[in-house]
Amino acid sequence: ILGRGYNMEFKVIESAKDPLFNEALKLYDDKLDIGLDEDSKIFKRSLENNKTENDYAFIVGIENQTVVSLATAHYEATTNSAFLIYLIAKESPNHDERMSLTLEAIEKQLNLLSQEVHNRDINFIMLEVPKEPSTVDIDDKLRNALEYRRQFLFENQFEKQDDIDYIHPNQNQKETPQKVDLFIKANIELTKDIYGTSVKSNYILKYVFANGISREIIYPLLKEMNLR
């Protein structure tokens, strides 16, 4: 158990056999109306494949024996940075507090991994966020959800970075990559020469090793982002 919020406790999921794993996936499936969704098999693969299993943080927030939030992230040990993939909370009057406590809990877990390797906290966390939509693109519900996400990130010390023209990769050759925004929460002063290398390392860890996307797709995208 990582710790408790107001009436929330947090647990680390280390195996797909953990009963909380399926409960967390159900919450994930229910929230797929926003963000960059993935096949739920990738959660299992990230927990179990030898390239990512020791550096994958998967936590759930529990209230009254029910999973009400989840967060997943990859810790990139070489550059001492992390890639926050999902941060989700069940809708409720205290949704904002659940989100903040869950973010705090995943940061604690990532810092535990960092302390084991470097004896200090992580340098930064990165997170992909869909671009701000034009007024004609989407309905009000989704626009509000996207605006809320950005506001939440700003309130929790994330900053949108503009040095990298960031691209979310296509899973296969039939799909097309998407331009998205990259938000970063830094614990040290960052310049592009520091975080560019880290972003590249996180990108490869996540998309080549966890998602299993071909290097033939990933490396040209890194080149396009000037990260090769």
Give residue spans per PLM region.
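Conserved acetyl-CoA-binding loop-helix of GNAT-fold acetyltransferases
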Residues: N94-S114
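Alpha-helix termini
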Residues: N50-K51, Q109-R120
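Alpha-helical elements of Rossmann-like donor-binding domains used by nucleotide-donor carbohydrate transfer enzymes
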Residues: E23-L27, L101, A105, Y148
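Terminal substrate-recognition subdomain of acyl/acetyltransferases
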Residues: G3-E9, I13-A16, Q115-R228
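Surface-exposed cleft-lining segments at the edges of enzyme active sites
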Residues: A89-N94, T135-I138
